[in-house]
From Swiss-Prot:
It comes from the Eukaryota. Keywords: Chaperone, Isopeptide bond, Ubl conjugation. One of its GO terms (biological process) is protein folding. CDD domains: DnaJ. GO terms for molecular function: phosphatidylinositol phosphate binding. There is a cross-link at K132 (Glycyl lysine isopeptide (Lys-Gly) (interchain with G-Cter in ubiquitin)). This is Protein CAJ1. InterPro entries: DnaJ_domain, DnaJ_domain_CS, DnaJ_X, J_dom_sf, Peroxisomal_DnaJ. Residues 119-161 are annotated as: Disordered. It comes from Saccharomyces cerevisiae (strain ATCC 204508 / S288c) (Baker's yeast).
Length: 391
């Protein structure tokens, strides 16, 4: 018997709800009350904040226990309640997959590059204005070769940008190598738990925990797509490894060629998606949103968000696929481990891949996911703009 049910009522659940049920209810209620969906409601932010606070308490076992026993006055987070919008993005921004895929920050590197070019463009414009002022002060007595000066300036700027991009790329590669090592270690731990479960005849318990984790991962941003990506990479790498052992390495020639062909296809798909989105964005930039009614504006913004999501997902997927392949290679090609053990690890990967590939969404969940991912994108863009302004 709980002292009060206000937080449970806000999320529309019973006091005996499981952690997964609480998270699902929070996502649904957060989408229903999100201020972006209620621009004309002055109380929208307060309602959204209330949903966030209810979840912050009920998702924390310690705070939930205090709330159930003593009520909400005794169940306040030590650091206070977080801002609902930032909390919403943090909870569903992909962190749940961290042990499987590492860093999943949409467009992080692209944003950094864009900021760098934007900053240097501003500096270049300011320098040009200063030069023009100097020229006018000389009363036209000293003339510069403007075209040559501009050309030299652009060459210099391009060199600086190239150096910074090379620096960013070097850092990205170092981060990637570190992530691959960490992810390989974590995947090895999961594989070991599977192998122990098989040997001890306790596979049912391992499967139950994995199924529960899959249910939670489905709630993440691009959750189902990430599960399918993991399944495809694990299955491909594991099957290729097992086949190479059966054919004494001869099949590696064919599987390697096939993998390279897939990589080329992925790169082509990424380029096509980017070009298609760019054309759509250019057309949309000609639209005057002030002339649209509320319904048309909502439809326009939804289309824009959808195009942006498509490009962001394509870029992230391409990068993730390469990272996951490196993780699998690190485990399966570790010569310090006997071949027989590595084959067993490959079979464990196939088991996990099968479970991930079996994940499904109902039509209602699919529509929820679409709306939800657009909201996540909106919050990430707001956060990015806020930090840009702060600088």
């Amino acid at each position: 018997m709980v002292k009060e049910t206000e937080y449970y009522d806000i999320l529309g659940i019973k006091p005996e709800a499981t952690p997964t049920e609480i998270k699902k209810a929070y996502r649904r209620k957060a989408m229903e009350t999100h201020p972006d969906k209620h621009p004309d409601d002055p109380d929208a932010q307060a309602k959204f904040q209330a949903v966030g606070e209810a979840y912050q308490v009920l998702s924390d076992p310690g705070l939930r226990s205090k709330y159930d026993q003593f009520g909400k006055e005794d169940a306040v987070p030590q650091q206070g309640f977080e801002d609902a919008s930032e909390y919403f993005t943090a909870i569903f921004g992909g962190d749940g997959f961290k042990d499987w895929i590492g860093e999943f920050s949409l467009f992080k590197e692209l944003n950094e590059a864009t900021e760098m070019f934007g900053k240097e463009d501003e500096e270049g414009t300011a320098a040009t204005e200063t030069e023009k002022a100097d020229e006018s002060t000389d009363g036209g007595m000293v003339k510069h070769d403007t075209n040559k000066a501009e050309s030299l300036k652009k060459d210099k700027l391009s060199k600086e940008q190239r150096e910074k991009l090379m620096e960013m790329e070097k850092k990205r590669r170092e981060d990637m190598m570190k992530q691959v090592d960490e992810l390989a270690e974590k995947l090895n731990e999961k594989i070991s738990r599977y192998l122990i479960a098989v040997k001890s005849n306790n596979l049912e318990e391992f499967t139950r925990k994995l199924d529960q984790e899959i249910e939670d991962l489905k709630l993440e941003s691009f959750g189902l797509e990430l599960l399918y990506l993991l399944a495809r990479v694990y299955k491909t790498k594991a099957n290729n490894f097992i086949m190479s052992k059966k054919t004494y390495g001869i099949s590696k020639i064919f599987t390697g060629t096939r993998d390279n062909a897939r990589s080329v296809k992925s790169a082509y798909n990424l380029l096509s998606t980017g070009l298609e989105a760019q054309k759509a964005m250019e057309k949309m930039s000609e639209v005057n949103t002030d002339e649209l009614d509320q319904y048309e504006r909502a439809k326009f913004e939804s289309t824009m968000a959808g195009k942006a999501l498509g490009v962001m997902w394509a870029m992230s997927k391409f990068e993730l696929e390469r990272k996951l392949k490196d993780v699998c290679n690190k485990i399966l090609n570790d010569k310090k481990v006997p071949s027989k053990e590595r084959i067993a690890k490959a079979k464990a990967m196939l088991f996990i891949a099968h479970k991930f590939a079996s994940a499904r969404r109902s039509p209602e969940e699919a529509e929820e996911a679409r709306v939800f991912e657009e909201l996540i994108l909106g919050e990430q863009e707001k956060e990015h703009k806020k930090h840009t302004v702060a600088r």
